[in-house]
Amino acid sequence: MKKVGLIGYGSIGREIMASAKRQEIPNAKIIAVFDKQSQVIDSVYNEYGDVDLFSDFDEFYNSQTYASLDIIIECASKDAVREFGGKIIESKKDLIILSVGAFSDKEYLTKLQYLSTLNSARILIPTGAIAGLDSIRSVRKYLDSLTITTTKHPKSLVGAPFFKSSKINLHNINSETVLFEGNASTAIDLFPANVNVAVALALAGVGLENTRVKIIADPMTSVNKHEIIAKGSFGQIHIIVQNIPSPTNPKTSYLASLSAIECLRSLCNENFRIGT
């Protein structure tokens, strides 16, 4: 039985916890939750009294509970990855990272990869709210171009740093509007809560600078849509994913939660895997 800890208890953390409690993840038991917000920790206690809870990372990190963990799942933010990722890897824990936008910092990515090798700890990035990362990885040496177009309802984009300097008023959008066209490195800085998928795609393929991203706001859509086009000497890959937004966080697709759950399930059943 693998002992699991969660960092962050937002919509994705709640879905992972609920799935584990329904015994849908064989060989996994969530025994700890860390979240900086004490009111969030209180809500976990009220719902699941048999889980050790922490709102201070040092207390969590130095606890006997932490020492017993096999796997930690980050489902908080890219800032949390940068703040805690190195320590977790140095403690020889396998780390599932959902806020892959943290790896727009190439130096930090290189650092974690080095620590991972040094400490024999694995870093896993779920496919998230898209599909086809296995295929993109398999043809990465043969890619000529890689693009992703993300379309979301304006309410899913509220709070994005992009709007601090843009003349576009999010609340006045009444038809499909292209907000951004550029590379994945710039996209994750301007839309950090919305395009982790672009960074995951870039890491699987041709890198952040060479992965093209278009972001569209559409007040008529009820789904989060991601369209991926990869072209090269191998042929062409065209993927369209239309996700239902998370019921508790419209910025996140429900598929992102399901992908994290499947990543944990696969990690806890190492004798049989589908896909690379």
What are these regions (language model features)?
Residues 100-121:
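Rossmann-fold NAD(P)-binding glycine/threonine-rich loop
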Residues 51, 91-94, 118-121:
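A short helix->loop->beta-strand "cap" motif at the edges of active sites that frequently abuts
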Residues 74, 97, 123-127:
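General beta-strand structural signal in soluble alpha/beta enzymes
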Residues 19-27:
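A short, Lys/Arg-enriched amphipathic alpha-helix followed by its capping loop at the start of a domain
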Residues 55-90, 102-105:
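Beta-loop-alpha module in the N-terminal Rossmann-like domain of NAD(P)-dependent dehydrogenases
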Residues 7, 124, 129-276:
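Active-site-lining helix/loop region of Rossmann-like oxidoreductase modules
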Residues 5-16:
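Glycine-rich adenosine-cofactor-binding loop
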Residues 27-45:
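NAD(P)-binding Rossmann-fold cofactor-contacting core
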